[in-house]
Structures are given as structure tokens and as C-alpha cells.
């Protein structure tokens, strides 16, 4: 089957929160495609620290320098979102070998659901290979400094979450 539109890529994730690793991947993908759509998944089952709207805002702020990058929230099956965006490429990041098994399984499932779309894996720059949103959330929740892992706007957002939970 032919590729839908190989000039448009979707980079999906929960982005709870967006990290410097995510930003690095978009920075490297943006020159490769005419259009990159960062799809921020609703994912209520993951119990996100930040609401979908706030995660979209933070990603938009972090990626504003790219004219060909847009950020959109979605609450549908990823395959439907990719088709709705007219994308021919699904971007995924691989931080370590430990990510591979899960990502391979997801790529195989997506190949069945959207056979016209290719999954492309990018590895992070070495200085970002250990960063994950879950680690950033945990460090922030415990009052640690996450400024080396996320943009300043995300540091502020996580601090607000921590302070609001402390008042409860």
C-alpha cells in the first residue's frame, strides 16, 4: 500500500510534561518534514499530572520556533488521529533498548490499523537519553530541581501542581 503523505509526520505522546528530550526529537524531525504534528494524547488512564489543555499549551510554547510544527490534543485512537492529520509517518523516540520491545509492538499494531503509515524511530541526543516524563514528574513532586530536563514554563507548571496538592 502507498504511503499516505510522507511529508507530514505525527509525533504522539502524553507529554506529561514535555521534556527537553521531546523537544530535541522535534528539533531534529522538523527539517525532515513539511509538517510535524505533535499529538498530545488525553490518556486519562495514565492519571496525568497536568490537564490536556495545559500540556498542549506547554508544548506549543516549547515548540513555537518551528513554523512547520503544530501541537494538537486528541482523545481518539491514535490510528484515527494520524489519518485525520493526513500523515504518512508516525514518529517515535527510542531512548534505550528497554523502549524497543514496547515500541516494536506498537509499531506492529499500527501497521495493521494504518498500513499506509510508516513508523520512524529516532534516538535522542545522548544528553537526553535518560530523561522521561515520569521521572521528571516524580522529581518535581518530591521538590527536586527539574530545570535541566524541561523548559522554564514546565518547571513553573509542575511547581504549581505541587503547591496546589500541598494545600489539599
Swiss-Prot record:
Site (described: Transition state stabilizer): 22
Pathway: Cofactor biosynthesis; coenzyme A biosynthesis; CoA from (R)-pantothenate: step 4/5
Key words of the record: ATP-binding, Coenzyme A biosynthesis, Cytoplasm, Magnesium, Nucleotide-binding, Nucleotidyltransferase, Transferase
GO molecular function: ATP binding; pantetheine-phosphate adenylyltransferase activity
InterPro entries: Cyt_trans-like (IPR004821), PPAT (IPR001980), Rossmann-like_a/b/a_fold (IPR014729)
Protein name: Phosphopantetheine adenylyltransferase
Binding site for ATP: 14-15, 22, 93-95, 103, 128-134
UniProt organism field: Xanthomonas campestris pv. campestris (strain ATCC 33913 / DSM 3586 / NCPPB 528 / LMG 568 / P 25)
Binding site for substrate: 14, 46, 78, 92
Cofactor: Mg(2+)
Amino acid at each position: 500500500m502507498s504511503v499516505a503523505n510522507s511529508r507530514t509526520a505525527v509525533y504522539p505522546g502524553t507529554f506529561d510534561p514535555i521534556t527537553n528530550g521531546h523537544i530535541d526529537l522535534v528539533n531534529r524531525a522538523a527539517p525532515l518534514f513539511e509538517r510535524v504534528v505533535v499529538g498530545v494524547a488525553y490518556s486519562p488512564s495514565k492519571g496525568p499530572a497536568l490537564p490536556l489543555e495545559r500540556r498542549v499549551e506547554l508544548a506549543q510554547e516549547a515548540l513555537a520556533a518551528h513554523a512547520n510544527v503544530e501541537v494538537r490534543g486528541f482523545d481518539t485512537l491514535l490510528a484515527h488521529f494520524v489519518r485525520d492529520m493526513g500523515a504518512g509517518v508516525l514518529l517515535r523516540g527510542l531512548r534505550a533498548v528497554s523502549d524497543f520491545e514496547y515500541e516494536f509492538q506498537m509499531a506492529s499494531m499500527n501497521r495493521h490499523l494504518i498500513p499506509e503509515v510508516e513508523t520512524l524511530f529516532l534516538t535522542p541526543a545522548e544528553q537526553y537519553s535518560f530523561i522521561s516524563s515520569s521521572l521528571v514528574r516524580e522529581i518535581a513532586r518530591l521538590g527536586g530541581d527539574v530545570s535541566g530536563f524541561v523548559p522554564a514554563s514546565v518547571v513553573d507548571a509542575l511547581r504549581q501542581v505541587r503547591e496546589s496538592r500541598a494545600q489539599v
